[in-house]
Each structure stands twice: as structure tokens, then as C-alpha cells.
Amino acid sequence: MICLPVVEDSVEKAIKTAEKYLEIADIVEFRIDMLKEVSEEDIEKFAKYPCIITVRADWEGGYWKGNNEERLNLIKKAIECNAKFVDIELREEKNKELVKFRDEIGSKTKIIISYHDFEKTPSKEKLVEIVEKALSIGDIAKFATMANSKEDVLNILEVINKYPGKIIGIGMGEKGKLTRILGVYFGSILTFASYKGKSSAPGQVDIDTLKEIWRLMDLK
């Protein structure tokens, strides 16, 4: 799957962009933390689309600086509305409570437990530890770490290969682009692409370029 991040500052623009993106991508990620204003009713609108709903906290590289309970309530609303995926940080102390809430109400939402490091990629052993911890909490483990070397790229792909269908593994930055191109081949459930320069993280490959590379390599 190819996911395009929706990085708009208003609900109206976000919905319009998502509809355009879904003509060329499999799924979108609504970056709720980048919106100037958002309500639970807006979350209900977003959840109708094939999407990941992410309200990324500022302490994990996001833009949400408001009340954390309000943030968690928006995620709960997405779960109530059966959003396809929600993303919750591994470092969020209440991530298990959100999974329990999902189970109690019988929601169909899949929960991604995510880890980010914008400076480096940990050792392969540490990455495995992170993935195991994330999978003990949610349905899918996601890690996005800065790739600074060929070794980082190899470690990321090896860890993805160990957990096919249960993981989203990403090497950020220019050196990490190979992980974005080959990650799905090794078992990542999706890769994040950019659209005409609009991206949510360093190193995202333009969707048209990504599709052309996959076509040339006979990857799907």
C-alpha cells in the first residue's frame, strides 16, 4: 500500500486533499496535529475515508502542543468511528488504555504503535526490542528512524523482513529512501510517499516516482 500524508491546516482543505490523493494512493494519513482547529465531529468525517488518523504529540516530533487528554479523546473518537487505523506513540503512557477501549467497544480500528528517532537508527537488536514491545500492545509496529549509513538501511530492512504484515519500517532522510522503496517488498504493510513536494517526513519519495520505480523493478 502507498499512503499519502495529508498535511493541511484546515479541515476543509484536508478533506479536499484526501479525496484527490485517494485517486492515486491506497490510503491517506490525516495529520490532525497540523490542523489549526479540529473537533470530534471532524474526526467522524475523516474516519469515513481509508485512512490513518494521527494526532502526533510535539514530544514525538509532531505539532500537537495542547492538552494530552483532548488529544487522546480525538483518538478515541476515531476508534469509535471505526477508522481503518489510528497511530499511537509507543511512549504514550495511555496507549494500552486506548487498545483496551477499542476492544471493549468492539471497534474494527487497527492500532499502530509508533516509535520515532529523528537523529539516528538504533542497533538491529534495539529495533527488534522496540517492535516486540509495540506488538505486545497494538496490532502493528511502526518505527521511523534516521538512516545515516548503509548499515542502518540493511538493519531496517532486516527487521521489516522479520515481521511481515505486522510492521511499518522506515528509514528517514536521503540515505533512508531505499527503505521507503523496498520496505513493502520486505513485509512493511505500507510506505509513505509525497505528492508534488508535500511531505510529512524527510526522505519521502514522490508517489509518481515511487510507482515508476516499482514498475521497473516489477514490485507491487
Swiss-Prot record:
It catalyses: 3-dehydroquinate = 3-dehydroshikimate + H2O. The keyword rRNA-binding does not apply. InterPro entries: 3-dehydroquinate_DH_AS, Aldolase_TIM, DHquinase_I, Type-I_3-dehydroquinase. One of its GO terms (biological process) is aromatic amino acid family biosynthetic process. Its EC number is 4.2.1.10. Keywords: Amino-acid biosynthesis, Aromatic amino acid biosynthesis, Lyase, Schiff base. The active site is at residues 116, 142. Pathway: Metabolic intermediate biosynthesis; chorismate biosynthesis; chorismate from D-erythrose 4-phosphate and phosphoenolpyruvate: step 3/7. It is an enzyme of class 4 (lyase). One of its GO terms (molecular function) is 3-dehydroquinate dehydratase activity. The keyword Kinase does not apply. 3-dehydroquinate binds at residues 29-31, 56, 180, 200, 204. Pfam families: DHquinase_I. Homodimer. Involved in the third step of the chorismate pathway, which leads to the biosynthesis of aromatic amino acids. Catalyzes the cis-dehydration of 3-dehydroquinate (DHQ) and introduces the first double bond of the aromatic ring to yield 3-dehydroshikimate. Belongs to the type-I 3-dehydroquinase family. This is 3-dehydroquinate dehydratase. It comes from Methanocaldococcus jannaschii (strain ATCC 43067 / DSM 2661 / JAL-1 / JCM 10045 / NBRC 100440) (Methanococcus jannaschii). The gene is aroD.
